């Protein structure tokens, strides 16, 4: 079976950590390659960086895209103060490359947005400020690449978080890492996820099977679906 539950993804991440495998640089590279395959160098890219590791992924992508000649702006509404260790290193690399961050969206729409606000771990409704930011991004009607899951969408249910439901990022593409939660394949999630892609981050089927154990082994099916 495929890696299709959030807890399976977490199990893979834990094994990678124990083995000393840094997945964030791989995720950021996969995102940067995805954008570069669809947008010419010199175009304006807006990277939305949240307060967790999803934000770290997008910061790695931002640094790589800037090095490739893209005009990259980073918006980090919560700032860098509480970033986890790996994401903090990604932030430091972005700053070392001359990058800066703003708390607010720019006045004009970019050519493409990378959504790295919240990942598969988000289980609470979006607050008012986050919702306002997402509404503005959606109103731009520009291509959006969501990393892991569109921010504001539950990876467990495939439905918008909140009661009443909020309004997630409406992605053109969703690039999942390691596995695609089954809920994101449900018909109701498609309107938010757009086209769905999977990157295994260079992890082998044997590694995935070891991580999730005999109750949820990943097979070569996942490998055949990998890559942006």
UniProtKB/Swiss-Prot annotation:
Q: Keyword GTP-binding, does the record have it?
A: no
**Protein name, UniProt field:** NAD(P)H-hydrate epimerase
Q: Which InterPro entries does this entry report, sorted A to Z?
A: YjeF_N_dom, YjeF_N_dom_sf
Where on the tree of life does the source sit, at the highest rank? Bacteria
Organism of this sequence? Bordetella parapertussis (strain 12822 / ATCC BAA-587 / NCTC 13253)
Q: How is the co-factor bound, per the entry?
A: Binds 1 potassium ion per subunit.
Native organism taxonomy: Bacteria, Pseudomonadati, Pseudomonadota, Betaproteobacteria, Burkholderiales
Q: Which gene encodes it?
A: nnrE
Matching entries from PROSITE patterns are given as: YJEF_N (PS51385)
Q: Which residues form the YjeF N-terminal domain?
A: 9-209
UniProt keyword annotations, A-Z? Isomerase, Metal-binding, NAD, NADP, Nucleotide-binding, Potassium
User: Binding of (6S)-NADPHX: at which residues?
Assistant: 53-57, 119-125, 148
| Biological role | Catalyzes the epimerization of the S- and R-forms of NAD(P)HX, a damaged form of NAD(P)H that is a result of enzymatic or heat-dependent hydration. This is a prerequisite for the S-specific NAD(P)H-hydrate dehydratase to allow the repair of both epimers of NAD(P)HX.
Catalysed reactions listed for this entry = (6R)-NADHX = (6S)-NADHX; (6R)-NADPHX = (6S)-NADPHX
Q: Which GO terms describe its molecular function?
A: metal ion binding; NAD(P)HX epimerase activity; nucleotide binding
Q: Where does K(+) bind?
A: 54, 115, 151
The cross-references to Gene3D superfamilies, in alphabetical order and at most eight, read:
YjeF N-terminal domain (3.40.50.10260)
Quote the EC number.
5.1.99.6
What cofactor does this one take? K(+)
Q: Which family does it belong to?
A: Belongs to the NnrE/AIBP family.
């Amino acid at each position: 079976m495929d890696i299709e539950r959030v807890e399976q993804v977490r199990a893979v991440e834990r094994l990678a950590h124990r083995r000393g495998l840094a997945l964030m640089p791989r995720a950021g590279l996969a995102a940067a390659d995805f954008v570069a395959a669809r947008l010419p160098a010199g175009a304006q890219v807006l990277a939305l960086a949240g307060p967790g590791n999803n934000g770290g992924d997008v910061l790695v992508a931002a640094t790589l895209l800037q090095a490739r000649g893209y005009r990259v702006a980073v918006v980090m509404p919560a700032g860098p103060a509480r970033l986890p260790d790996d994401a903090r290193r990604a932030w430091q690399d972005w700053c070392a490359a001359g990058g800066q961050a703003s708390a607010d969206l720019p006045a004009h729409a970019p050519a493409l947005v990378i959504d790295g606000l919240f990942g598969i771990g988000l289980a609470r409704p979006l607050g008012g400020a986050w919702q306002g930011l997402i509404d503005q991004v959606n109103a731009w009607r520009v291509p959006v690449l969501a990393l892991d899951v569109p921010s504001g969408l539950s990876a467990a249910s495939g439905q918008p978080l909140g009661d009443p439901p909020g309004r997630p990022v409406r992605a053109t593409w969703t690039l999942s890492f390691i596995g695609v939660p089954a809920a994101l394949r449900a018909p109701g999630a498609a309107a938010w996820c757009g086209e769905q892609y999977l990157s295994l981050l260079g992890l082998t089927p044997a590694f995935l099977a070891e991580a999730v154990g005999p109750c949820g082994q990943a097979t070569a099916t996942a490998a055949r679906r990998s890559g942006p």
